[in-house]
């Protein structure tokens, strides 16, 4: 993160104010203030993650992934013959906190702040799948988007999507 001295001073002052406004997290803000004031390059990358950017395309892809899971659930609910489909395989698991934290953060924002897909079960880990899911979801999306009736999927189509 490249910042001018003036920008670093402004951010340092913001962290100083946050220590007073939020005493429970004061130690964290003091640490961040020190990093900014001294310009520690390695630790500045941590701040870059906090202020990172997610492209519009990535956001739309995540929404499409969540919408696909909604469609899977609606289709599964409407099936008369479930053909040994396990409902747990249809559930949206989220993303891996260790390797896909930005995606996970966006999912939590969409559910908790925007109020979308609130019917999804966040589980005990708050949509942390604890295993990387991005590639799997991409394969699933490709199949789902090729289905002619995306919200009226057959058992065979559901099976193809979840087994992608």
Swiss-Prot record:
InterPro entries: UPF0304_YfbU, YfbU_alpha-helical_sf, YfbU_helix-hairpin_sf. Pfam families: YfbU. SUPFAM superfamilies: YfbU-like. It comes from the Bacteria. Belongs to the UPF0304 family. This is UPF0304 protein YE1336.
């Amino acid at each position: 993160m490249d910042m001018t001295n003036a920008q670093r001073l402004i951010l340092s002052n913001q962290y100083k104010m946050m220590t007073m406004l939020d005493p429970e997290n004061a130690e964290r803000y003091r640490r961040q203030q020190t990093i900014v004031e001294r310009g520690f390059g390695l630790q500045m990358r941590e701040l870059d993650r906090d202020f990172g950017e997610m492209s519009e395309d990535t956001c739309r892809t995540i929404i499409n992934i969540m919408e696909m899971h909604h469609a899977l659930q609606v289709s599964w609910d409407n099936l008369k013959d479930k053909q040994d489909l396990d409902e747990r395989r249809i559930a949206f698991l989220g993303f891996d906190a260790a390797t896909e934290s930005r995606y996970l953060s966006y999912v939590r924002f969409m559910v908790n702040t925007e109020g979308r897909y609130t019917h999804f079960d966040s589980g005990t880990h708050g949509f942390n799948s604890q295993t990387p899911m991005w590639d799997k979801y991409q394969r699933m999306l490709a199949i789902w988007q090729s289905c002619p009736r995306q919200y009226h999927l057959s058992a065979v189509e559901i099976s193809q999507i979840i087994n992608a």
